[in-house]
Amino acid sequence: NLITRDIRTQRDKKEKWASFKHEHATELRSLLELDHTDMKNPGTLLGFDIDEERGLILLNYTGQAHNELHDIEGGWSQPLREMRGLIYDFTTEVPTLVSRGFQKFFNANELPENTYDALREKYGDREYVAREKADGHMIEYFMHRGELCASTRGKFGTTSSIEALSMFTADKFSEISE
């Protein structure tokens, strides 16, 4: 609601986002659980896209977040990990979650919590399988007001998300997503 109160169109985003993220730095730092850092402008970690026609906002961490947060202890806070393709309908009185992508996850040894020693400590002698995380392209399918929609984790209306819609009908998607 903090963002969509003032920014509801692509034009608003273009004209207002730079000043908005500076004006609301303290609120954004708190929202992203980064109060323990000296990060001056946490708004640079947050990206979003707007689908004006459907009244949707898609939230995602930015490339800058990906590059900077590995070097900050506790930088990948839980809200930032979950802010990976979150889609809200902002036409409702309180923004309503429509879809959420996969939570951010990491390669083995990419963060201290994902070292093999940390995994052994966490899981003990229980057997677990660790696989390499391959880079790829995430398409997020979701139903909104009876319509099958698709996006990437950071943008509406991309070529790949439009092409992805040709793979399913709303009925088929509903059938396999149950």
Give the predicted meaning of each segment.
Residues I139-F142:
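Short beta-strand scaffold segments in enzyme catalytic cores
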Residues F173-E178:
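Short, intrinsically disordered, charge-balanced linker/junction segments flanking boundaries
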Residues N1-D135, R153-T169:
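Active-site-proximal "nucleotidyltransferase
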